[in-house]
Amino acid sequence: TAYEIKECEWSSDVCSSDLGPDFQNLHRNKRSITLNLKTKEGVAALKRMVKKADVVVENYRPDVKRRLGIDYKDLAKINKKIVYASISGFGQTGPYADRPGFDQIAQGMGGLMSITGLPGQGPVRAGIAIADLTAGLFAALGILTALLEREKSGKGQHIATSLLQAQIFMLDFQSARWLIGRSEEHMSELQSHSFISYAVFC
């Protein structure tokens, strides 16, 4: 089928709900619809919603959304005021643009794993999906800025961020030390290379 609508029974007693904690955390205050965008009917249903929408957020690879006919250029023809936010693994252009992304891959490629943990331990990932969360925050900031700008121009725009971009941003101190002093970062016995008295004390 092209699309499916399911009603979730939300309860004020979240602890006894049949919906798991992750589902409740991520989907509270949302209305959901599942679309099969590999069908003409599914794409048509999406485009009907876009006519009245303010924002579209998507995390398809660039080649996939172009193939489906739902990239920014396609949807802006339907609604010129649409703010279209893309969150991808490696950005909309470049040699890795059409590769799928995953939080742990971004942590590794962005350099975070190489400075997390203790010396001799090997690369360690952060305990949370930090690249996912940071990229989402960047997208939210971009959306809000685009909506504010739209109040003046009357036009929407395409904003984009990526897991890798967000992860590299998180290593701003390390990047500055390398660019200016060619100082290479290493795992650091729970101490900071930037600040005095920034460590774990017992």
Task: Label each region the model flagged.
Residues 1-16, 186-192:
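Short, small-residue-biased leader/transition segments that mark boundaries at the very start
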Residues 17, 109-188, 192-197:
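Acidic, glycine-rich segments within the central catalytic cores of soluble metabolic enzymes
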Residues 29, 82, 104, 133, ...:
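A contiguous active-site-proximal alpha/beta segment in oxidoreductase catalytic domains
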Residues 33, 83-85, 159:
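Hydrophobic/aromatic beta-strand patches that form the interior of the parallel beta-sheet core
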Residues 52, 199-201:
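Domain-scale activation on soluble regions of proteins
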Residues 58-114:
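N-terminal Rossmann-like NAD(P) cofactor-binding subdomain of oxidoreductases
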